[in-house]
From Swiss-Prot:
One Pfam family in the UniProt entry: Ribosomal_L6
Subunit field text: Part of the 50S ribosomal subunit.
InterPro entries: Ribosomal_uL6-like, Ribosomal_uL6-like_a/b-dom_sf, Ribosomal_uL6_a/b-dom, Ribosomal_uL6_arc, Ribosomal_uL6_CS2
GO terms (BP aspect): cytoplasmic translation
NCBIfam families the UniProt entry points to: PRK05518.1, uL6_arch
Protein name listed in UniProt: Large ribosomal subunit protein uL6
Cellular component annotations (GO), alphabetically ordered: cytosolic large ribosomal subunit
Length: 184
């Protein structure tokens, strides 16, 4: 059963940003680069009209309204990415064995984690830069999902299973997302 006759969400396009829609693909170009994403849901129309991105659906059901607002959030994140970018900060924590972290190509190499001989590896997604400064790792990029996934890959590479986490707290942890500290 439809909720309303239609749902329409509008996003203002800021100065210096270009948005183009071709079929189901939304492209956002800005000062930091270009992000492209495919957004498809049956009956949902996305178009640019008078300096605004419009997301529209006729006779929406509850799920359709949720999808329209999700698409709005995705496009807002794309616009924020090409204007400001996204930054995650991770901290290297160890008590006994000093962990060495270095970037090699599209991988982060973690050596001497808990005294292990074999290095652990974490994948860096395309379009993301990783910098290591002492005990801090900075992950930056314009695609929010790629930056978040790269930070998660690094954090998961040092995950400890079958040991008491209250005692063995060594690892690499996300401590800041988009300038906001993460509390544990």
């Amino acid at each position: 059963m439809p909720v309303d006759a239609w749902v329409r969400e509008e996003i203002e396009i800021p100065e210096g940003v270009e948005v183009s829609v071709q079929g189901n693909t939304v492209k956002v170009k800005g000062p930091k680069g270009e992000v492209e994403r495919e957004l498809f849901w049956p009956g949902v129309k996305i178009f640019v009209e008078g300096g605004k991105v419009v997301i529209y659906k006729d006779f929406p059901r509850r799920k359709d309204v949720a999808i329209v607002r999700t698409f709005k959030a995705h496009i807002n994140n794309m616009i924020k990415g090409v204007t400001e970018g996204f930054t995650y900060k991770l901290k290297v924590v160890y008590s006994h064995f000093p962990i060495t972290v270095k970037v090699q190509g599209d991988e982060v190499i973690i050596e001497n984690f808990l005294g292990e001989k074999a290095p652990r590896r974490a994948k860096i997604l395309p379009g993301v830069t990783v910098k290591v400064k002492g005990q801090e790792i900075i992950v930056e990029g314009i695609d929010k999902e790629a930056v978040g996934q790269t930070a998660a890959n690094i954090e998961q590479a040092t995950r400890i299973t079958k040991w008491d986490r209250r005692v063995f707290q060594d690892g690499i942890y996300i401590v800041e997302k988009a300038g906001k500290p993460i509390t544990f």
